[in-house]
Amino acid sequence: MTRYEMAQIVAKAMAKGANVDKLAAEFADELDSLGVRVANLEKKADNVKITGQIRASYKDVSGDKKDNNMRLRSRLFVNGTINDDWTYTGRFHNEQYVNGNDGKGSAGEDDLDFNWAFVSGRVGGVKMDAGRMDFTYADVVDVRGDGVKLAYGDDVKVTGWVFKGNSDIEMLSDDRVYVAGVETSFGAVDTTVRYYRADTEFDNEIVEVALAGEIAKDLTLRGTWFNGTTDDKAETLAGTDVDTNGWLVGLSYGGAKASEPGSWGVYANYSDRPFATYLLPTNLSGYADAPYALLNESSVAGAAKADGYEGYEIGANVTLAKNIVAAVKYFDLEEREGSKDAQTLWSEVVFTF
């Protein structure tokens, strides 16, 4: 095409453009009104987003605590934009047990629960989440509750939580928990210090000091020290002094990313955790009466006498295809002051859509 032919096309377009301008001027009010309605419609269409997750898992426990079940968890997440600074998140959750039971003596289909409902935004420079959500610092507590999370800062981040547990798990149900923490980095080492105060029957107070850093590409070493105190009731139940200091060390390589097929990771942890140094860590949260059901202790007194647990956990995960991640874990834990032990093999495939 010559430049002259191109100029002819441009001239025709300009002529049509002039006609469009005239029509736009004539129907300015109507177009204005229509434009507002269309813009608002488009904005509202993007205002709510629904995503989902299917989690199929199998757990087999041997040793003094024997149990097995196959569980299917279905979740729908509702995310809505309130304004430029605030959002809303809700979650519908259903559990089905193909075999075994849920640890509370029931099996089969569970009800559909609406178990997340919280808003997120900023008040000045403080980030806030408020409502019903999960409260998880994996080595000390992992429970759903009603409350508030606050965070301030970047290089040095100060955090604060206050919540009341509301899950089916007996531990922390209706107990108020307060958490304050500081997170920062010293060179390549990430450092976290947290203080926990829980209004449980033992009036738990826990201090957690955690360090983590890469020692080689994608290879991370972490270590944590815990100090926990309880009121006299725990020692009365145990019939002896309860230990107050615990520790954990872990090594991990890589990690599966749902958006990257073929990505994978492995890890290993070893821990020595007296009864006073945790509330409900993630590795115990799958048990309805955790922590004492883990080792088949039928009462809080039994758990106090056992004085917590020690042992190791190893695991691996891989992204099989985009948004499909498989994971497997093995725990071997025993009572610190008792004779009971439990071995748990746990596997899961997560589909995200």
Predicted segment positions?
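N-terminal periplasmic/intermembrane-space "pro-region" immediately following the signal or transit peptide
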Residues: 1-55
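Outer membrane beta-barrel
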Residues: 3, 49, 53-59, 65-192, ...
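Outer-membrane beta-barrel pore domains
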Residues: 2-3, 17, 38, 57-69, ...
